[in-house]
A protein has these predicted regions:
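Cytochrome P450
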Residues: 1-432
């Protein structure tokens, strides 16, 4: 389909403000209208091109020479010195170094620990019959995994909880005097200071037992492994002095890991429980067919779309599908909408754990494909395997109102009351 300028500037029948966090409380009709009527729509209020179709989000994500991340991925927010706000070759340089901490081998080694951790958390709630799934469960798994990847002690882990939530709360706030943004900046500075101390400790003791140690070694030696498996798997090295990760780059990545890696997985877990609660037949299907867990994970990521949006900046004047785009124009990609595109997914608003094929964009696509995708998949898989094995009928207590935070970036579910039959009633062996 070729768009016309008229379609690009069409007036929707309802208010669409893609920078208003409340828009994402119930955006589905707006997404459908955009996909059908103006898939490349000019948002006059925010001075953005809004992109809603799977095909177009994929195209923009794959062509960084035309749609750059280097000018920032969030509107009205300065581009941080972070891997998500870089184009190649700089992006690829950092990605090659950082990816050593997230190989399939590393994730496989973590799987048993994630299972143990999940069961420890379930132990705390199993006899209660109810919980706040976010506060009592989903918040803990990804943060503890990240903390242990980083080699943090229990006290540092507790501070990490506070810093992560405070930094994420700053999303959507642009006034530098806003107390929420000030607090987020202070939390980021405190976290960075701790990371600097840890980097110096790893440098002093030479340890490569955790992610900070591995990446500190990458900084000091500028070395990549010959096998691509990284220092967690061995120390065969090829000396490449151009591949040096600076301390500031490492700290910025760790901030991204804590904020994005924690928040997105937390929301995938919470949104996954919402999806199973809305579609109880799919819950039953997974209980009866546990071998569907891998495809269920992919469907959770598609249906939930924990990351809702990102921005790119046009690098040169060109025409895309009949619409003239100018250098400096900002393009706002709606991943949630792309993952509900009728042109790609049959019955896209249905949650189907055996959906195949499932070419979702929940982890992105192209050069910025999520570095932590393997880890996120493992966490989601293990959590729902263990959760449904022990609390077989767990479900959201109510679905008419899901409480979200003030974010236009991530789903940001803040609370989710859940109910279930106490474990001992399903399994007498668990009775005290």
């Amino acid at each position: 389909m070729t768009l016309t300028e008229g379609a690009a500037t069409a007036t929707p029948p309802f208010d669409i403000d893609v920078l208003d966090p409340r828009f994402y409380d119930d955006p589905w009709e707006a997404y459908r209208w955009l996909r059908h009527n103006a898939p490349l729509w000019w948002d006059e209020r925010n001075q953005l091109w809004v992109v809603s179709r799977h095909e177009d989000v994929s195209h923009i994500s794959r062509h960084q020479e035309t749609y750059s991340a280097a000018h920032g991925v969030r509107p009205k927010v300065a581009a941080p010195m972070s891997i998500i706000s870089m184009d190649d070759p700089e992006h690829n340089r950092q990605r090659r170094l950082i990816s050593r901490g997230f190989t399939p081998r590393v994730v496989r080694r973590l799987a048993d620990h994630i299972r143990e951790l999940s069961n420890q958390i379930i132990d705390e709630i199993a006899e209660r019959g109810e919980c706040d799934f976010v506060e009592d469960f989903a918040i803990h798994v990804p943060l503890i995994v990240i903390a242990e990847l980083m080699g943090l002690d229990p006290d540092q882990r507790d501070r990490l909880y506070r810093w992560s939530d405070t930094m994420m709360a700053g999303d959507g706030h642009t006034d530098p005097d806003d107390p929420v943004l000030v607090a987020a900046a202070e939390a980021g500075a405190e976290f960075a200071a701790m990371c600097s101390e840890l980097i110096e400790q790893r440098r002093a003791d030479g340890s490569t037992d955790d992610l900070i140690g591995v990446l500190t070694k990458a900084f000091d030696e500028g070395a990549l492994t010959a096998t691509g498996e990284g220092a967690f798997a061995g120390n065969d090295r090829v000396d490449r002095t151009a591949d040096i990760l600076t301390p500031d780059e490492l700290i910025m990545f760790l901030i991204l890991l804590v904020v994005a890696g924690n928040e997105t997985t937390r929301n995938a877990l919470t949104g996954g429980l919402v999806a199973f609660s809305r579609f109880p037949d799919q819950h039953r299907k997974l209980l009866e067919n546990p071998d569907l867990i891998d495809s269920a994970v992919e469907e959770i990521v598609r249906y939930v779309s924990p990351v809702m949006s990102f921005m790119r900046t046009v690098t040169h004047d060109h025409t895309y599908k009949g619409v003239r785009l100018k250098a400096g124009d900002r393009v706002f990609m709606l991943y949630q909408s792309a993952n509900r595109d009728e042109a790609v997914f049959d019955d896209p608003d249905e949650f189907r754990i055996d959906r195949d094929p499932n070419p979702h964009l929940g982890f992105g696509i192209g050069t910025h494909y999520c570095l932590g995708a393997n880890l996120a998949r493992a966490e989601i898989k293990v959590v729902f395997t263990e959760l449904f094995a022990r609390l077989r009928d767990i479900r959201a207590a109510r679905l008419d109102r899901i409480e979200r935070g003030d974010s236009s970036l991530v789903l940001s579910i803040k609370h989710l009351p859940a109910v279930f039959t106490p474990e001992s009633r399903f399994n007498p062996a668990k009775r005290p």
